[in-house]
C-alpha cells in the first residue's frame, strides 16, 4: 500500500515538472547558443551555472567565470519538456553528445535520522575547584621573601601557618616557551572576616616592597598537594636511603718475623748447618750463605 502511494506521488510530481537538466555540455557553449538549439521546442529560458576561479597570474584573470558543463532549460509546460528530452537526448551539440532528463527539485527529508549522533554540547559548565575558607594564595612574590614579611602583611588576620614554595608556569599556551619559576605562598588565617573580603582588602591596600601583590582564596587541592610535598621531604630527610655495603678488603699475606730470620742466619754461619724451617706453614725459608 505504501509503495503504491509513493509511486502515485512521484508520477504526479514528474507530470508538473517543466525544467530539463542537460549534462555533458561543451565548455565553449554559451546560453545564447543553447537557447537557439532548443528554440524549436519552446524553451523560454536557459541557465548555464558557472564558478569563479581566481588565479595569481593576471593573464588568466580576463574571464574568471568557468562553466560547469551542465545547463537547465525552462519550458512552457511538461509536454514540451518531455518532447525535447525524447528528441534531443543523445544528440550531438558542438561535437559533444548531450544527455537530457527532467530536473527533479531536491526536497529535504522531514523525518530525523535516528542513526546520526547528536553533536556534543560545547558550552559545558566547567567545575569550579573548591576553595578553602581560611587559607589565601599569594602569587608572584619576590624570590627571597621571608616568613616574617608575609606575617606582617596579614597581621590583622592572625596568620597561623605559612608555606612558601616555587612552581613552574607557562605564560603562553599557544607558543611553547620555556617555563619560568614563580614564588608563591599559602597562608592560613584565623579571622571571622570572609576569605573573599580579606583577599580584596589586602590586594587593594597592602603592598610588599613597594609593589602590589595578587591574593586569592586558595584551592583545597593545592593545599593538600603542598602539605604532601612537605611531608615527603621531611620523611626523606629523617630516613635517608641506606648506603651500599662495601666489599671487605682481602686479608694481607703473612709476613715472616725479622727476628726469626736473622736468628736462623746466625746459626748457619756458626755451625755450617742449614737452619730448620721457621714453622710448618708456607712461610718462605732463607738459605745459608
Curated annotation (Swiss-Prot):
Signal peptide residue numbers: none
Listed Pro residues bias regions: 239-255
Classification via InterPro entries: Nucleotide-bd_a/b_plait_sf (IPR012677), RBD_domain_sf (IPR035979), RRM_dom (IPR000504), Rrt5_RRM1 (IPR034244), Rrt5_RRM2 (IPR034247), RRT5_SRSF_SR (IPR050374)
Domain RRM: residue ranges: 18-105
Keyword vocabulary terms for this entry: RNA-binding, Transcription, Transcription regulation
Note in the entry: Present with 51100 molecules/cell in log phase SD medium.
Protein name according to UniProt: Regulator of rDNA transcription protein 5
Organism: Saccharomyces cerevisiae (strain ATCC 204508 / S288c)
Phylogenetic classification of the source organism: Eukaryota, Fungi, Dikarya, Ascomycota, Saccharomycotina
Gene that produces this protein: RRT5
Amino acid at each position: 500500500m505504501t509503495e503504491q502511494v509513493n509511486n502515485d506521488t512521484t508520477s504526479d510530481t514528474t507530470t508538473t515538472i517543466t525544467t530539463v537538466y542537460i549534462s555533458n555540455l561543451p565548455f565553449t557553449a554559451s546560453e545564447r547558443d543553447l537557447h537557439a538549439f532548443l528554440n524549436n521546442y519552446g524553451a523560454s529560458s536557459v541557465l548555464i551555472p558557472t564558478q569563479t576561479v581566481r588565479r595569481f597570474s593576471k593573464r588568466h584573470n580576463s574571464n574568471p567565470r568557468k562553466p560547469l558543463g551542465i545547463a537547465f532549460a525552462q519550458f512552457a509546460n511538461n509536454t514540451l519538456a518531455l518532447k525535447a528530452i525524447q528528441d534531443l537526448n543523445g544528440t550531438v551539440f558542438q561535437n559533444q553528445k548531450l544527455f537530457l532528463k527532467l530536473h527533479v527539485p531536491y526536497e529535504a527529508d522531514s523525518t530525523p535520522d535516528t542513526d546520526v549522533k547528536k553533536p556534543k554540547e560545547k558550552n559545558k559548565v566547567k567545575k569550579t575547584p573548591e576553595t578553602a575558607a581560611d587559607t589565601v594564595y599569594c602569587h608572584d612574590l619576590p624570590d627571597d621573601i621571608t616568613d616574617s614579611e608575609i606575617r606582617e602583611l596579614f597581621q590583622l588576620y592572625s596568620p597561623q601557618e605559612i608555606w612558601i614554595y616555587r612552581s613552574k608556569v607557562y605564560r603562553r599556551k599557544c607558543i611553547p616557551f620555556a617555563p619560568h619559576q614563580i614564588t608563591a605562598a599559602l597562608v592560613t588565617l584565623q579571622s571571622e572576616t570572609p576569605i573573599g573580603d580579606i583577599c580584596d582588602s589586602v590586594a587593594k591596600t597592602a603592598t610588599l616592597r613597594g609593589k602590589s601583590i595578587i591574593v586569592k582564596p586558595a584551592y583545597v587541592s593545592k593545599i593538600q598537594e603542598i602539605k604532601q610535598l612537605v611531608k615527603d621531604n621531611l620523611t626523606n630527610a629523617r630516613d635517608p636511603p641506606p648506603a651500599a655495603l662495601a666489599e671487605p678488603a682481602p686479608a694481607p699475606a703473612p709476613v715472616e718475623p725479622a727476628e726469626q730470620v736473622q736468628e736462623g742466619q746466625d746459626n748457619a754461619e756458626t755451625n755450617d748447618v742449614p737452619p730448620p724451617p721457621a714453622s710448618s706453614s708456607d712461610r718462605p725459608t732463607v738459605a745459608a750463605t
